[in-house]
Amino acid sequence: MSGLERAMLDVVCLCAEWCSACRAWRPDWNVAVARHPEHRWQWLDIEDEPDLMDEVGLDIETFPTVLIARGGQALFLSAIPPQPAFLDHLLARLGAKDAAPQSVAPEAVALAQRLAARHRA
């Protein structure tokens, strides 16, 4: 793994088009994407990916939910408040070279690995 890959985070918003909170959060998400080009960003509508969600055993009930990973290793998976400052803080904490690994659910690990494999394909 190169130094660039270690520094880059994969940041995935697990959302649904029908969710008004997700739609309201999207403009702030887009601002975060523009502000942090060093990371790889994905807006993943879970309704468009039912097979993937079933495969990893993940049932998202609260939106927006964010997965943050590095090189296929899940670092964080949780619903977050739709506030840009909260996301910035999370990225700063998890993006630090000396960041302590978080305990994450096996479903988060599986999802991070599947999404990383997609990027390599």
Feature map (PLM): residue ranges:
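N-terminal leader/targeting and pre-domain segments
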Residues: 1-9, 88-121
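Local sequence-structure signature of Cys/Sec-based thiol-disulfide redox active-site neighborhoods
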Residues: 1-35
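Short amphipathic alpha-helix with an adjacent loop that forms part of the alpha/beta core around
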Residues: 2, 53-58
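Short loop/turn motifs at secondary-structure junctions
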Residues: 8, 59-62
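Thiol-based oxidoreductase modules, predominantly thioredoxin-like and allied folds used
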Residues: 14, 37-53, 81
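Residue-level signal for well-ordered alpha-helical positions
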Residues: 25, 55-56, 90
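Non-catalytic, surface beta->alpha helical segment in thiol-disulfide oxidoreductase systems
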Residues: 62-103
